[in-house]
């Protein structure tokens, strides 16, 4: 019986032991200021605990509801380990979307934000509680520091001009006249590099950051 663990049984163990040693030495991830409760939980405890469930956390409830949806075109479950968003990740994502195009000037809708959030969750393991904005009316600033896109309302003239022509689909967000917004404003994403240096949301709403 004592010979069950022979030398041949230990093949590969030194490599596994080294991986285990490195794992225990990995520094804790510091979430970006403004990341939500589930992300804070993940950063502080290494997992999402019963402090954040579908019954008491909107992001968790929303994610569980999305797992049954197939309209976004990719799997909802993440392909990488869950992790809280950091300042650098929010910053890098902002410039990636700016450089690659597509988000700047795009009319905001809840569905479009959901698609972006699900893409981040699926490809990066980032929980969607990073993607929040200050309340309106007017410009909505990102709650998470490092995210450099704000939501800017269009004027009535801009909305009217954008609606001209016969090619606009009736269900396009610009034609919905702010149906997804509490203040019925038509909002567009605008890149603002100064948001990487100045946390406007925290200046305007310090009460949002009491637990950060």
Curated annotation (Swiss-Prot):
Residue positions bearing lipid (N-myristoyl glycine): 2
This protein's UniProt keywords: AIDS, Apoptosis, Early protein, Host cell membrane, Host Golgi apparatus, Host membrane, Host-virus interaction, Inhibition of host adaptive immune response by virus, Inhibition of host autophagy by virus, Inhibition of host MHC class I molecule presentation by virus, Inhibition of host MHC class II molecule presentation by virus, Lipoprotein, Membrane, Myristate, Phosphoprotein, Secreted, SH3-binding, Viral immunoevasion, Virion, Virulence
Example of a GO biological process term: symbiont-mediated suppression of host antigen processing and presentation of peptide antigen via MHC class I
Localization annotation: Host cell membrane; Virion; Secreted; Host Golgi apparatus membrane
Membrane disposition: Lipid-anchor
Post-translational modification note: The virion-associated Nef proteins are cleaved by the viral protease to release the soluble C-terminal core protein. Nef is probably cleaved concomitantly with viral structural proteins on maturation of virus particles.
Site (Might play a role in AP-1 recruitment to the Nef-MHC-I complex): 20
Record-linked InterPro entries: HIV-1_Nef_anchor_sf, HIV-1_Nef_core_sf, HIV_Nef
Positions of region (Acidic): 67-71
GO cellular component assignments: extracellular region; host cell Golgi membrane; host cell plasma membrane; membrane; virion component
Note, other: HIV-1 lineages are divided in three main groups, M (for Major), O (for Outlier), and N (for New, or Non-M, Non-O). The vast majority of strains found worldwide belong to the group M. Group O seems to be endemic to and largely confined to Cameroon and neighboring countries in West Central Africa, where these viruses represent a small minority of HIV-1 strains. The group N is represented by a limited number of isolates from Cameroonian persons. The group M is further subdivided in 9 clades or subtypes (A to D, F to H, J and K).
Family named by the database record: Belongs to the lentivirus primate group Nef protein family.
Assembly notes: Monomer; cytosolic form. Homodimer; membrane bound form. Interacts with Nef associated p21-activated kinase (PAK2); this interaction activates PAK2. Associates with the Nef-MHC-I-AP1 complex; this complex is required for MHC-I internalization. Interacts (via C-terminus) with host PI3-kinase. Interacts with host PACS1; this interaction seems to be weak. Interacts with host PACS2. Interacts with host LCK and MAPK3; these interactions inhibit the kinase activity of the latter. Interacts with host ATP6V1H; this interaction may play a role in CD4 endocytosis.
Domain notes: The N-terminal domain is composed of the N-myristoyl glycine and of a cluster of positively charged amino acids. It is required for inner plasma membrane targeting of Nef and virion incorporation, and thereby for infectivity. This domain is also involved in binding to TP53. The SH3-binding domain constituted of PxxP motifs mediates binding to several Src family proteins thereby regulating their tyrosine kinase activity. The same motifs also mediates the association with MAPK3, PI3-kinase and TCR-zeta.
Protein name as catalogued: Protein Nef
Source species: Human immunodeficiency virus type 1 group N (isolate YBF30)
Recorded name of the encoding gene: nef
